[in-house]
Amino acid sequence: MNDSNRLRLTWISYFSYALTGALVIVTGMVMGNIAEYFNLPVSSMSNTFTFLNAGILISIFLNAWLMEIIPLKRQLMFGFVLMVLAIAGLMLGKSLTMFSLCMFILGVVSGITMSIGTFLITHMYAGRQRGSRLLFTDSFFSMAGMIFPIVAAMLLARQIGWYWVYACIGLLYVGIFVLTLFSEFPVLGNKGADAGQPVVKEKWGIGVLFLSIAALCYILGQLGFIQWVPEYATKSFGMDISQAGKLVSDFWTSYMIGMWVFSFILRFFDLQRIVTILAALATGAMYLFVSTDNPEHLSYYIMALGFVSSAIYTTLITLGSLQTKVSSPKLVNFILTCGTIGTMLTFVVTGPIVAKGGAHAALTTANGLYLAVFVMCLLLGFVTKHRSHGHVTH
């Protein structure tokens, strides 16, 4: 594979994470406007976004096998057609059924693209470089989280229709589509297999279970927190939509900076120990945010939370890939799927909590989930295999 083609595939991976990040993160910003558009309470409206998360989950789960049947290039080109149809449906459709269908399609496209992006990084890069590349790729999720809430706030403040926010997100897929046209993709399945090398199956071990639970709790906690921050800030502290949007943007800006910093720092530390410390710090920072009565402190606490939690998810995935001597794409995909289940459950879990106890109750629940991540990381220390495989500094 030549360097220019590798660079194009790497940028496809970057954009794939940005696309998923944008779709998932702007939900909290546009939810109120969409609820008003369909004359529904916000807590009821949040349930329809489960279609987006379900689409992401189903496509990531199925694509572990579909990638070996349908060429990656064809999947991405077909995804572009689906993306155009879904955004057109959001703009032209007036029913809740059409909205839910379009959200599901956007989820499917996003999940397929992100699973391909993750595969490309794990396929093209190995060892220490894989971990840092995955972390940098994941930073584009955060970058989208920094940019698109600002874009959404600008559009909504000017009374521009909420569906234009999704049209702006669609521009990311235009970039993916153009790069795809000029790229050569690795071949999977029997055509790409080396017939001369037997496949050796390794047992995953109980450490993978702890990592999977941690991944699920982390994503559910993170999204359950960040999706309800705008609602919490406006209702509890009387902020306007721009101020609430800035809080979300502050979180993802700090998160992105943290990813860049930790991509250099992590190689000097044992991954299990550092992720345990980061989970403890993140739990503490979220507790400070949830418990403070001073609106001026919210920005400081949410930036601290973003920074210390930035490396947790990617480190969990990297630790998962190091639980076997030879990295297993299916193992990585399994942990990624568990994280995506957390995404899908976001509004299923937090919707009823908000309906009964308000946004503050959802944030407190998210804090409890972060505590569960810390416990899982602590337990992992007793069973992890990454040290015995000589992967301590990866």
UniProtKB/Swiss-Prot annotation:
Keyword Transmembrane: yes
Coiled coil: none
PROSITE patterns linked to this entry: MFS
Gene3D superfamilies for this protein: MFS general substrate transporter like domains (1.20.1250.20)
Location(s), subcellular: Cell inner membrane
Primary location class: membrane
Keyword Thylakoid assigned: no
UniProt keyword annotations, A-Z: Cell inner membrane, Cell membrane, Membrane, Transmembrane, Transmembrane helix
Cross-referenced PANTHER family: L-FUCOSE-PROTON SYMPORTER, PROTEIN TSGA
Family membership noted in the UniProt record: Belongs to the major facilitator superfamily. TsgA family.
Protein name: Protein TsgA homolog
Name of the gene: tsgA
